[in-house]
Amino acid sequence: MSSKLVLVLNCGSSSLKFAIIDATNGEEHISGLAECFHLPEARIKWKVDGGKQEAALGAGAAHSEALNFIVNTILAQKPALSAQLTAIGHRIVHGGEKFTSSVIVTEDVIQGIKDSIPFAPLHNPAHLIGIAEALKSFPNLADKNVAVFDTAFHQTMPEESYLYALPYSLYKDHGIRRYGAHGTSHFYVSQEAAKILNKPLEELNVITCHLGNGGSVTAVRNGKCVDTSMGLTPLEGLVMGTRSGDLDPAIIFHLHDAMGMSVDQINTLLTKESGLLGLTEVTSDCRYVEDNYATKADAKRAMDVFCHRLAKYIGSYTALMDGRLDAVVFTGGIGENAAMVRELTLDKLGLLGFEIDHERNMAARFGKSGTITKDSSRLALVIPTNEELVIAQDAARLTA
């Protein structure tokens, strides 16, 4: 079988993951991460030919600078690899009601992504930058760009999960409902959990926790999403890096009426100044919170609120499992690496039969998967996500 090399771009709110993947066998030829956008330490790391490299992007750099570096520095050193690219796959957080599966990028698709910006104000603009840069840098692949939507996996949610208790006309006429996010990741780790448990995906009941700068929990019953913590936008749900997650909607009225904040100021507060950043008043980085948990009140406060919220979601989703929960799965940058988050969260769920194994938990970090609970416990797993592989496979399939 001939190779099908796909350039995968995953533009997050504060980072950009990229890879060249052979969609036929999953082999990664180049992979990397640009992170700490808008901060002094903005940087890019990548792996090629077994070697690791790193470079500073410059203080305050973001998506455009990172993409320029990828095209003009990294790929420029591998012209033969660039010449073999057959498609470009883009991770898109929000497709609204318009997109229920992956699609080839057209002007209509770009407009649809723009129309969904109010639903994903941190992410969709970043995705559009990625698409624009890809179209500019690879004109020979102009009709081979594919958008893969994080909202697609959640389209199986039943009405009782996706509807808000608002006038029904707001859903019918304006699409105001719960959509979820991180669907590509939740789908991937569900597939992997099924393999580990030696079960068909359609018989699998798991609760998947994708924890990164953004975070969400998904209830997967019989292999399909039946509920998820993010809502109309990626602002609902868990405590995140800079996002508040769930809060009393009347707080917004209070901030506006009693404190004189404008709608734009409130939007900025909830999406960019809250979460771990708001609770610590120092940083959105979970590594700071974990490293300083025992010594700094701000770190302990942030960690405790973060894990309390996460445990509540996991606990509530057990009610949707029809009496059988096969495992809880942790993934994403925090889920895969923050052993303390996993331990503090599962310690709150002893009633459900979870008992952490400290040594296993510490071993399952830095890209390593594994069981993190004792043999006598209900199962909890760490499974490193691979959204890029799912995106590459979809891109190859649609452009074949």
From Swiss-Prot:
Catalytic activity: acetate + ATP = acetyl phosphate + ADP
GO biological processes: acetate metabolic process; acetyl-CoA biosynthetic process
Cofactor note: Mg(2+). Can also accept Mn(2+).
Cofactor(s) the protein requires to work: Mg(2+); Mn(2+)
Active site positions: 150 (proton donor/acceptor)
The protein's assembly and partners: Homodimer.
Protein name: Acetate kinase
Organism: Yersinia pestis
Organismal lineage: Bacteria, Pseudomonadati, Pseudomonadota, Gammaproteobacteria, Enterobacterales
